[in-house]
Amino acid sequence: MARWAQSLDPGLLEQAAQALRDRTQWNESGVRPSAQRREAENESENLLVNRRSMRSFLASPVPLDAHLEKILAIASQAPSVSNTQSWRVRTYCDPARQEELLALQDGHSGISPIPLLLLVTVDIRSFSGANERNQMWIDGGIFVQQLLLAIEATGWSSCPMNFSATNSQAARLRKIAGIPGYEEVVCFVAMGRADAHPPASSLRRGVEFLRGN
């Protein structure tokens, strides 16, 4: 165990220790240092800097007509391989229906009641050959990021929720949600109006952690 611990990246250990300190300092005392966010120099940067995963929503419903259509129209401008645009989005606002679906996701316990739940899938018929076997996840991930930014840009908040499930869980989700076999589930996205006093978020890693050389 000692040798294994010594092999870990010191930066990873420090990040874990910082997360524990954050939980004690911010979540229990309610202090949110403003210095943890980078200053934006223009409106575009402001959107990118201030988007956060929101886990606490107001109870107000999300209008499924004008707002959602606008969000999806913006999200659909995301790039994709050969411009295949293979994404699909399903929406759920009924709490009982949401609970049925999220019971298979098993990672939403820290999120307040969700005004609108989105389920993002990718049509794998758009890809062919072994060289494109992972392209669905790349295109799906790019689309989800564009979707999150579109939600933020239109005045709403969101939280992506992964679907790292077993084959049996995935099969049950397909059956419940009516997802055909040629679509792969990318993730869920919770959407709504942000609570004015959400739980404090953890620190972001510095740019030095991003550089690979």
Label the model's feature ranges.
Residues 1-213:
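Acidic, surface-exposed loops and disordered segments
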